[in-house]
């Protein structure tokens, strides 16, 4: 259970770093937003889901 918690925490830290780099690149590229909108929304949604997963796993571990 602790390994799942550690992986979820690592992913919830890694995804925002990827989004911080990826979103400005998408917005700066020509025709980038219309073609990559789903990828940006998927990354943001997965980060929100990981925040809830970390909270649930934290309550199970403690």
Curated annotation (Swiss-Prot):
This is Photosystem II reaction center protein Z. Its main location: plastid. It is a multi-pass membrane protein. The keyword Chloroplast applies. It comes from the Eukaryota. GO terms for cellular component: chloroplast thylakoid membrane; photosystem II reaction center. Pfam families: Ycf9.
